[in-house]
C-alpha cells in the first residue's frame, strides 16, 4: 500500500555517497477534493537499498509522527544520508498552511530535527528555490518580513543554521558559486 500511496507525490533522492535511494512522500493527496485521490497515510520516507530494485520492507519513517502531523513541500540531499526539508507550519488537513520552517532528515536513523538558528518562523516570508551545497553544508537564502534577506549556512549534523551575508534586496531566489573555466 505504501508504494501505491507514493505515486504522483514522491520525490526520489539518491544518497550519492552509498547509492541508496530515498523516496520522500509529502502525502499531499490529503488535500485532494476527490475522495478517490485522497490518502490517509502519513507523509513519510521509504528506501531502496543500493544494488536492489525493491523497497526495503524494514524501512519506513513517518514524518508526521515526528512533527505533530506536519508535512513538507520540498527536500534536497546535502551530504551522506542527510537531507534538508522545507516544512509546513501545520498539518495539511488544516487550512492556511505555509512552508516556513527547515528540518534535517537523517536517512540511517529516520530522525527529523528542526533547524535552529533561523529567524522565527512567523517572520520568515520565503526561502531560496534551491540550496547551494558544498563541503557537507547547505547554503539557503532566507527572506523575512523584517530586514534584508540573508544567506544561512546549515550544518546538517547539528541541524544548526548560521547567518552569513545579508543582501540589500527584497528577495533572493538562489545562491551558487561560479567556477573558472579551464
Where are these regions (language model features)?
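Single conserved hydrophobic/aromatic residue that forms the stacking wall/gate
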Residues: 1-8, 12-13
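C-terminal structured domain segments
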Residues: 111-166
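Short, conserved, GDST-rich strand-edge loop motifs in beta-rich repeat architectures
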Residues: 23-42, 85-99, 143-144
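Beta-propeller blade signature
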Residues: 37-53, 98-109, 151-156
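Beta-propeller domains
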Residues: 7-9, 18-49, 68-71
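Structural signature of eukaryotic scaffold interfaces centered on beta-propeller domains
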Residues: 10-19, 71-81, 89, 122-134, ...
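Surface-exposed loop and turn segments in beta-propeller and other repeat-based domains
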Residues: 7-9, 51-72, 112-125, 167-181
Amino acid at each position: 500500500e505504501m508504494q501505491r500511496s507514493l505515486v504522483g507525490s514522491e520525490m526520489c533522492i539518491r544518497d550519492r555517497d552509498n547509492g541508496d535511494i530515498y523516496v520522500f512522500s509529502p502525502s499531499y493527496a490529503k488535500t485532494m477534493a476527490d475522495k478517490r485521490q485522497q490518502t490517509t497515510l502519513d507523509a513519510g520516507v521509504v528506501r531502496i537499498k543500493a544494488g536492489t530494485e525493491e523497497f526495503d520492507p524494514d524501512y519506513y519513517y513517518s514524518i508526521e509522527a515526528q512533527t505533530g502531523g506536519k508535512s513538507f513541500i520540498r527536500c534536497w540531499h546535502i551530504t551522506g544520508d542527510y537531507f534538508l526539508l522545507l516544512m509546513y507550519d501545520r498539518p495539511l488537513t488544516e487550512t492556511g498552511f505555509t512552508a516556513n520552517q527547515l528540518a534535517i532528515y537523517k536517512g540511517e536513523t529516520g530522525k527529523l530535527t528542526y533547524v535552529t538558528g533561523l529567524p522565527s518562523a512567523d517572520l520568515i516570508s520565503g526561502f531560496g528555490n534551491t540550496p547551494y551545497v558544498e563541503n557537507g553544508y547547505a547554503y539557503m537564502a532566507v527572506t523575512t518580513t523584517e530586514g534584508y534577506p540573508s544567506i544561512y549556512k546549515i550544518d546538517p549534523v547539528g541541524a544548526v543554521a548560521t547567518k552569513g551575508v545579508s543582501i540589500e534586496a527584497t528577495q533572493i531566489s538562489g545562491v551558487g558559486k561560479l567556477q573558472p573555466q579551464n
